[in-house]
Each structure stands twice: as C-alpha cells, then as structure tokens.
A protein has these predicted regions:
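Short hydrophobic beta-strand that contains or immediately precedes a catalytic carboxylate
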Residues: 12-16, 184
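A short acidic-Thr-Gly-centered motif at the start of a beta-strand
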Residues: 1-8
Length: 188
C-alpha cells in the first residue's frame, strides 16, 4: 500500500471503552494512516446516535422513534460493536460526511429480522430525490445489504425504515479504492 502498488483495502479496527467510542484518539491515528497508505473511506459507523459513541467523520441526525439495545444489558444476538437500534416505521437517520467524499462509494447496512413477520427494508434517499432500496433481512441473523453510488450522491443521504422495519446494527461507508479504513468501536 505504501508504494501505491496494491489495490487492497485494509480495515483496522480499534476496540476500547467509551474514550475509543468518542473517536478522538482514533481520528488522529486514522488521519496518519490514511495519509500514508490511502483513504479507503469512512468505514464502520454505529447504528445511529448511541450514548458515548461519536464519529469524527460524519454528523448523524435521527428522526422518529428508535429503541436502542446495548449488549451489556442483555448479551443476545448483537453485531460487532454491541449496539443495535430498532426503528419504528418511518424513522430515519440523516448522515452527512464532515469532509467531502470522492470516487465510487459503497454504503452497507447490517440488519436483522427480530420478529416472526417478514421485515420491511430500508430506503436510502439522496438530496436530489433519488431513492434506492436496500434488501430486507430474511432471518434473525445479522445480514448485510449495500448500494453503490458516486461520492457526489453520498455527501448527504438519509436511511429510512419501511413498514415492519428490521433492527439496525451498523452502517459502513467505503471508498472503492486502495487504502485504509480505521474504525473505532467503544464497547461499553
């Protein structure tokens, strides 16, 4: 990567407590690693606003009703990070990167069905009015679904829950280019 001869993406994940979850120390490390090896994107984000978790790279605005689950309270079926958010129909998260994105991007969400009825999916809306569907999960295991878009489209977007929404476990934004992502997971 350092010689710019590789097409690989390296994902680095820093695990820690709420200080890590605040993304202060990790952001300085991320900047150095991406400057040296290339920027492969924002990487892993918590499933919306979670107490003691923050991203130095994006602003998140949540609308509607959400119920947050934390693994320390009941450690059953959690994604990496130990948090999950259950939206009511129509609830949404607006995600605005703090720095402009460039190139082709992939937005991935981790979701799971947490009831017997078939889950609805998610809609990803862009400022120009374009809406893309993300696949609904088929089981109660965590599953990923993604869409691709140009950075121009992804400099602001809204993730909206449909009818009978699945639980949200993570949002991941990757630049489809060689380099490094550095994720901070404050597991409390």
């Amino acid at each position: 990567l350092e010689r710019k001869e590789s097409s690989e993406v390296v994902h680095i994940m820093q695990l820690g407590d709420s200080h890590t979850g605040g993304d202060y120390f990790t952001q300085a490390y991320r900047e150095q690693m991406q400057k040296r090896f290339g920027n492969a994107g924002i990487g892993w984000l918590s499933p919306g606003y979670i107490k003691n978790q923050r991203s130095a790279q994006v602003l998140m605005r949540m609308n509607g009703n959400w119920k947050t689950r934390v693994s320390r309270n009941n450690p059953e079926n959690f994604p990496l990070g130990g948090f999950a958010n259950q939206p009511e129909p129509g609830a949404s998260i607006e995600i605005v990167p703090k720095q402009p994105l460039f190139g082709l991007q992939r937005v991935t969400i981790w979701t799971r069905r947490n009831h017997d009825d078939a889950s609805g999916g998610w809609k990803l809306s862009f400022p120009d009015g374009e809406v893309r569907d993300l696949l609904a999960p088929l089981t109660s295991n965590w599953q990923s679904s993604y869409v691709m878009g140009s950075a121009i489209d992804l400099n602001s977007f809204t993730l909206r829950a449909e009818n009978n929404p699945p639980e949200l476990g993570a949002i991941i934004i990757d630049t489809l280019a060689p380099g490094v992502t550095v994720d901070s997971l404050g597991i409390v």
